[in-house]
Amino acid sequence: MLKNALYLQVGAKNSTISYFKFLFSAVFLLLTIGFFTNNSFAQPVRWQQRVKYTMNIDMDVITNRLTGKQQLQYSNNSPDTLKKVFYHLYFNAFQPNSSMDVRSRELGKFLINDRPDWDPRVKDRILNLKPDEIGYQKIISLKMNGIPQPFKYHETILEVNLTKPVAPKSTVIFTMEFEAQVPLQVRRSGRDNPNTKVRYSMSQWYPKMVEYDYEGWHPTPYVAREFYGVWGDFDVTIRINKNYKLGGTGLLMNAADIGWGYDVANTPDLKPITAAKRTWHFVGNNVHDFVWAADPDYKHLTRKMPNNGPVINVLYKNTEEVAANELAWKKVADAAVIVLPFIEKHFGKYPYPQYSFIHGGDGGMEYPMATLLVGPGLGTVIHEWMHSWYQMMLGTNESMYAWMDEGFTEYATDLVEAFYRDSVTNAKNGDSNANEKVINSEVVLLPLEHNPNYKSYYFIAKSGLEEPLTTHADHFNTNAAYSIASYSKGAVFMEQLGYIIGAPVRDKLLLEYYKQWAFKHPNSSDLMRLAETVSGLQLDWYKEYWCNTTKTIDYAIDSLWEEAGESKVRLKRLGQMPMPIDLQLTFKDGTTLHYTIPLNLMYGAKAAETSQPVVTLEAWRWTHPTYIVSFKQRLTNLLKVEIDPSKRMADVEQKNNTLEIKW
């Protein structure tokens, strides 16, 4: 240190420096080939299996049981010879002492903030189900190309050892007869929720072929977490009591026979029939699951998006507060119309002919072309609809990459909610063109909308409970760790990626991700490879630290001094995860200097995000704990130093990121 140098040590005793303190608490249709190929990036090629279901279901609303006949055309597009196949039998989880039951009760023994860690919707309820309340799926017969096949139950998985292997690049036909009992509503699928009073929420209701991909079979037992399915086409016919009204995946093919707002004439009621049961015929193409719901008292709202957009269906039951309830569900339909142009602008076109928001016994829970909702809350409504992009159209293996499903959905939901709030405000202020302005804007969206996700991440990072994002969804030690990892840390991943590569580049990435990987089951490496291509930066380090470890980010302002006619700011990395740094200096005259310090592992720096002049400095080597920034102004003119003024970097100790100097 030079003699007469002005030196300020941050944190030193009797320092005249004060800090800003930031307090954070824990809290359809296939797209055309041209659509995917008309871009400047190389197209991914990966084989995928393909299914075509034809199912005929007869539902007994007295016994709550159904019988079904299923024909499954299965195309083995892999280079492998398949000696066996697997089916999911999800209803079998709803039996006392099932894996789901025991797992829930074991999690309930662990207390976080004096509360059991189990899902409050599940708790120990499965243990107490009576014989006529449990769920089950039983296979009566199973044939492949007309030949009976031996099978073995593994609770929620059916193993079929084939009498003749399925050769590569061949197609076989499985025919099955099965019966099932719909469980009392516990989680997702079921009947007779006493709160919503919806009779049937029919998700995970049929024997579903397990996905086989480049990593092999994925016969994941059902313990209430995530899903993964084979893309294909569903043709489903349901016979049920004639007074019941249905909604679900796909298009209603016999709408003219049904009426009730589905038909062209918009008939308000079900068309009268003399038979005791009515047949509903749905077809959903290029989806990886099929959901339906049924209740005799459903109301039905519809909206038609302009420019050949999808039909929006809203099915709901009235509560005692009829007027308020109907207004709330009407807002669901209207909100969907308002936000879809914004969604498609930023995340890609919705390709299916309809979407149904359905009052169900549990939810929100997302499915292709439909979601189940326990109520009309718009936050949940938007979240579940955004799952149409991050899962229903991209189809990652949720068990392995829950953060790419829930996290990206959470990220998108925050932006769509903010847009909707602005739209409502604009309408109240009489600006009829404001929505279009916002939709077409290229503004940098900073994490004000994402603040709760940052708070939740900080909580889990400091709790000692955090586990890496690479943990299989079923195998997190706590529900808290799973939930925050998949939702909050996944959302922060995407916002923070915008900090690293620049928000406009991140937004371009999201559209390219949709264009290149829709209907192709991308994994995290596929995403990062594309991110590197779009940004021109190396990002493997980001995935390694953020996804594969629980190392945290913590940067601090260490010291200030003058030396040889220049002022100096020393920054220090205290956390174990290195990052690029945005730095802002504010002076007494109101001027500011903005710097970006790339991480050497990036082999480049992000482009300017706004018209604000930014100086790109030499890269900070990850091996070096400190970095010095020099500037010409006198140190006595400096008022404030800020690391990451946009607050997009998930620094677990924000208080040492800002230094305000009181001279």
Model-based region annotation:
Residues S40-T67, P96, L539-W541:
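N-terminal, polar/Ser/Thr-rich
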Residues R50-V51, L89, F282, N313-R570, ...:
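Hydrophobic alpha-helical and helix-loop surface patches within well-folded domains
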Residues Q70-L72, L89, S170-L184, F234-K242, ...:
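Short, hydrophobic/aromatic-enriched beta-strand segments in well-ordered soluble domains
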Residues S75, R115-N195, A619-T636, S646-K647, ...:
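A surface-exposed beta-strand-loop module
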Residues K84-I147, N243-Y244, T586-L599:
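Solvent-exposed beta-hairpin/edge-strand motifs
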Residues S99-I112, E179-F234, K647-W663:
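Glycine/proline-rich low-complexity spacer/linker segments in large multi-domain proteins
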Residues M209-G216, A224-I382, Y411-D414, S423:
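Hydrophobic helix-coil surface modules that form long, contiguous segments used
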Residues L252-A256, P504, W517-W663:
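Non-catalytic accessory/interaction domains
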